[in-house]
Every structure is written in C-alpha cells, then in structure tokens.
Amino acid sequence: MAKKHDQKSHVDTADHEARGLEDEPRPRMKNKEYEHELRRLHGELVAMQEWVRASGAKVCIVFEGRDTAGKGGTIKAITERVSPRVFRIVALPAPTEREKSQMYVQRYIPHFPAAGEVIIFDRSWYNRAGVERVMGFCTDHEAQRFLELAPAFEKAMVDAGIVLLKYWLEVSADEQARRLESRIDDPRKVWKLSDMDLKSYARWDEYSRARDEMFAASDTPWAPWYVAHSDDKKRARLNIITHLLSVIPFEPIPKKDVALPKRDIKDVSGPHGAAPPPRDIPTPF
C-alpha cells in the first residue's frame, strides 16, 4: 500500500538543494545497488499502474530543470517496465505559428490524462517561465502574466480530479559543465547537444533567477514543487520514484491466480503444414 504524503512544498525546506548545494555530498551510487532498488520500485510502479487503470485515476507528472539535469533518464527509469497504454510521455516541440496565436496553455490541454492514464510531461507549460523567458522567446510581461495565471490553471486541473505532481531536477554548475562536455566528446551523446544548450549554459544566473521567481509564484498547496538534487542521477531517479509512489494514494489490486491453459500443438510439417518464412535474418551473434 502506498504511504500517503502531505502536499507540503519542498521548495523552502530544500532551498539549498535547489541551488545545487548539499551539506555533505554522498558518494555516487553503485550500479548493483541502483539496479536492485530500481527493480523493487518497478514492481511498485506496476502495482500503481494497475490501480490507476482499475480506479480510473488521472495522474499528471511534470518534470522541469536545467539542461542535463536528468529529466529524460528519470522518465525512462519510471516508464521502462510499465504499459505505454497507461503511461504516456509528452515532449512537445516548439510551438507552431498557429499555436503561438492561441492561449498559451492551450496546446498542452489535449494531452492531459483521461481516466486510467498517467501523463508525464518532459518539460511543460513552465517553458514560459524558464527557457522562453531567459532566451527572449517571450516578453517579461508575458512571463509574469503566465506566472499569475498558473496557480488558477493548476487549481482547475486538481479540481477536475487530476493528481498533479511537479518535479524540479537541479544540477550543480560543475556537474552540468561535465555532462555537456561529455556530449561534445562522446559520439553516442552528440545528438543531445544543441545550440540552445550552449546558449543556455552561458546564462546560469538568469536561469537561477527565473527558477526562483517560478517557485515563488507557482508553489501552491494544491500543486507544490518538489526539488530533486540530481548530480547523482541514480539517487535522484530512485528518490523521485519513491516520492511519487508515496504521494499517489494507490491501493494494490488483488492478483488473480493465473495458470497457463492446456495447448494442442500439432505437427504442422508436410504438404499441408504452415509454410516456412520467406527468409531468416543473419545470425552473427
């Protein structure tokens, strides 16, 4: 059974973590320990999934954070053992000209969860308070107006029965630099590096101010922000999964006893048997 968690914000109590500081940094988690804990948590996520499906719950999880903070890896860790019919990931591209003419949050609304769904936003409507504001894609007035409206918008979501969780993954300046350098040097990661990443990297303080203003304006009792320090990606993933399982008030669904039925396998070789496949793939391994 999930432990119910109050919706008290972690922004004030973990303010030093939001700035990439820890009193006593812990050693990075070893792979063996990480895989053991993740396997256990995957079982709990599947149990939560079955409750969501059976109860018709609607869950929306928002992930925000600086570039390289680990949003994508965290989302992958959450979703790799659950059904894509229940868990859906939404990562919207830059708005089209038509979308730019609409109410700002309008393009996100069609992706909100229906009954029995968990929707995960890999960046969200908070782009307006972060990257759009810092990089000049919106005016200060537009950003401030968004921050004024966001609490009411999210209150409407919660009042409609959506369980809304908002996570900010905070990476330190040194760790962000290390991760960006690895993207430059590693041919497997070079696709992750964009011109926007480099421009954003140079504006650390501007992003910090935008983050703090976002927290101040949109950290509410009904939709609080939760901060996860993510210099150690493995610990961050486990901490986030553990937390969301504690906040979502799911109840395990009793399992039915299942056994494989008897199966009649006939010899299908011969002139009336099944035709062989047209070709096999090579087997170099």
Where are the model-predicted features located?
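Glycine-rich phosphate-binding loop of ATP-dependent small-molecule kinases
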Residues: 1-285
